[in-house]
Amino acid sequence: NATADVEATSRCFLELLRKGQLHPAVLEGKSEQLRMLQEAQTITIKGIGLKHVNLKKASQKLVQKQESESTKPISTSLSAKLDAAPFVHLHNHSQFSVLQATSKMSQMVSVAAENQMPAIAITDHANLMGAFHFIKAVGNHNKDAVEEAQIKPIVGCEFYVCEDHKDKTRRDDGYQVVFLAKNKKGYHNLAKMSSIAYVDGFYYVPRIDRQVVAMYKDDLIVLTGNLYGEVPSKILNLGNRQAEEALQWWHGMFGADFYVELMRHGQEDEKRANEVLISLAKQYEIPLIATNNTYYATKEEANAHDILLCLKEGEKQATPIGRGRGFRYGFPNQEYYIKSSEEMKILFKDLPEAVLNIEALIDKIEPFKLAREVLLPKFGIPEAYLVPNDPDGKLGENNFLRYLTYEGAKKRYATLTDEITERIDFELSVIAKTGYPGYFLIVQDLIAAAREMDVSVGPGRGSAAGSVVAYCLKITNIDPIEYNLLFERFLNPDRVSMPDIDIDFDDEGRAKVMDYVIDKYGSNQVAQIITYGTMAAKSSIRDTARVLDLALNEADRISKLLPNIKLSKIFGLPEKDLKKALRTDEFIKVKEFMALAEESSLSGETIQQAIVLEGSLRNTGTHACGVIITPDDITKFVPVATAKDSD
């Protein structure tokens, strides 16, 4: 309340002046004015009689009044429709919104199943890192569920849409807009946009722009998003005309696949934005969709989620939420969880169409799988070994592999005995049957190139040492016949699976090999594998303790009570099973740890919140040596991002 602030500040200043309590430099040369003030004002400076209004409370009363006026009883038939209609959460963030959400895939699926929801969506911030895990989690549920309880997985993404994603001269985080894939093609368009956001558009956050949206808009559904979406944000910050222009662009771009998203988390700004959004939706005949912007699975996890946000910002939880110096980022309330169908229907009982429209939206979604057969890059073979009418090139690859193997065998063995040729032919037949001749050609080429560059290559590790073909190709340097090593442990004709050859390069040479792979196959077909750093038991204790401002020595004492076991097991296993899994001294410490968790002290609170946060994603990185090579542009298959230390 600016009026109250000005009056209070003025009174304080005049009172200090009257008492001569200001700094001498301020009072210098003003003795006469000070004397006159003190003579005229002999008592404490009083207020001037302003009637101060608590604007926050007044605003809340106004909102409540408006809500009560707008809430009209709906007809019996419409009420029955609403009761029978399915509700589906279409705006959800998982742990893969790193340090922003705590929801695990299993939790999301469980909540959907408990509420008989026919579908559920994942819409992490700008990335699709969790898409495979999400579809797998839903698939695991569906395997054991009856047909009526099947859940449809909806893969989506909440993108930051800015003015120009390549402009890095000024910060522009853009607007947060939700995209949902209608089918597999839509998923690939999401993957393309996510790759562009990270590779070309990363500046503070991964960004795309309208040009990118227009290029990859096919088979996608768009929701207007939260208060940071383009249309709601312009309603609140620029004006209704600008918001309407934005809505016209999105509606023109996506037509019947564009929906106006309404949220009710109990915020005043939502009420203001929703009134205009509803009006615009009616004007342009755009369907309304009710959502809850979820970041944690249950309301009880709200505090743990707030601790996670503090970790991200490097703040203490005791710091008040707000903007500016002395404040920290945090959510305004505890309503950002995966609410039940009943809760959502009550929230939108005055706007039943916002719930009823969901069914038509999810009917547009075609489920798809991301698990697929292994894709290998095309390995160029000499024309002499090619076979006509060989569309996938496997026959030619088998021919060339046989040639290289026998050429190598002549150098490896003084005499090619029947035993050796039988073993080679057997292995080549299994390789041909499994369909992976190209894999051996790629690996032998890679190792040959490494040796030419004087890179140290290991002699062979793991089950690949049991392959005579690998030995003849100089992939390994251990003769499996001499040491009676079994090929079947490496590649079994009765259980077809991808061969796995572990290759060791020296640390300095690894970069040379990587450069060779990029030069041979192209930078757009080669990528390193992303890794995820999660909060383990002890690190979740220490991180939580730091945010809650628990004494460092107490945090160390608690973490030292933990053996190498997950918190979820400590509090999830029956005591007899836990006792079997631990040594006697470890079990005694764990019992002390569990007793501490029951306390209402700060130590107990730390443990309870750490249990929720355990397993949360802490950071991303790159695998030390894992590399993916694809047969075409890698972004046609999976989304990519740029590593922090990459150029």
Describe each model-derived feature in a short phrase.
Residues 66-647:
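Alpha-helical scaffold/interaction cores of sigma-54-like transcription cofactors
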Residues 1-43:
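Acidic, Mg2+-coordinating catalytic module of metal-dependent nucleases/exonucleases
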Residues 27-87, 142-148:
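Acidic, low-complexity intrinsically disordered tails
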